UniProtKB/Swiss-Prot annotation:
The keyword tRNA-binding applies. It holds the Pfam family Ribosomal_L16. This is Large ribosomal subunit protein uL16. The lineage of its organism: Bacteria, Pseudomonadati, Pseudomonadota, Alphaproteobacteria, Hyphomicrobiales. Belongs to the universal ribosomal protein uL16 family. Part of the 50S ribosomal subunit. PROSITE patterns: RIBOSOMAL_L16_1, RIBOSOMAL_L16_2. It comes from Methylocella silvestris (strain DSM 15510 / CIP 108128 / LMG 27833 / NCIMB 13906 / BL2). The keyword Ribonucleoprotein applies. NCBIfam families: rplP_bact.
Length: 137
């Protein structure tokens, strides 16, 4: 699963996601993409599950680009522990995704196969998404 090799700080503030994506809202690599329509924190496990669903459906054909990287440590206190006594230990890694952000890109497969693959990936994510396609000139 994706996670940073090293970080400046062990724990991070919870943070909020305000407004639309300030970058990464256009297709850069592939012909097709999956765009987020809602703000949400997406975990490394969810990204990996979506990637596996796509690659299996495409039968390893084409190319997949993951445009998001989980760089925010999410801490969690153990179960049945009383409140207080400090912040919990880092449990997982997540990425804050703003609306409009392109999360995955595909290339080298037909449009119908790409749409199905990205729809399967979308089912693994906790947000509403949209299939987008590069305009042919």
């Amino acid at each position: 699963m994706l996670q940073p090799k090293r970080t400046k700080f062990r724990k991070a503030f919870k943070g909020r996601i305000h407004g639309a994506a300030k970058g990464g809202f256009e297709l850069s690599f592939g012909q097709f993409g999956l765009k987020a329509l809602e703000p949400e924190r997406i975990t490394a496990r969810q990204i990996e599950a979506a990637r596996r669903a796509m690659t299996r459906h495409m039968k390893r054909a084409g190319r997949v680009w993951i445009r998001i990287f989980p760089d925010v440590p999410v801490s969690k206190k153990p179960t049945e522990v009383r409140m207080g006594k400090g912040k919990g230990a880092p449990e997982l890694w997540a990425v804050r995704v703003a609306p409009g952000r392109i999360m995955f890109e595909l290339d080298g497969v037909p449009v119908d196969l790409a749409r199905e693959a990205l729809q399967l990936a979308s089912a693994k994510l906790p947000i509403k998404t949209r299939f987008i396609q590069r305009i042919q000139e």
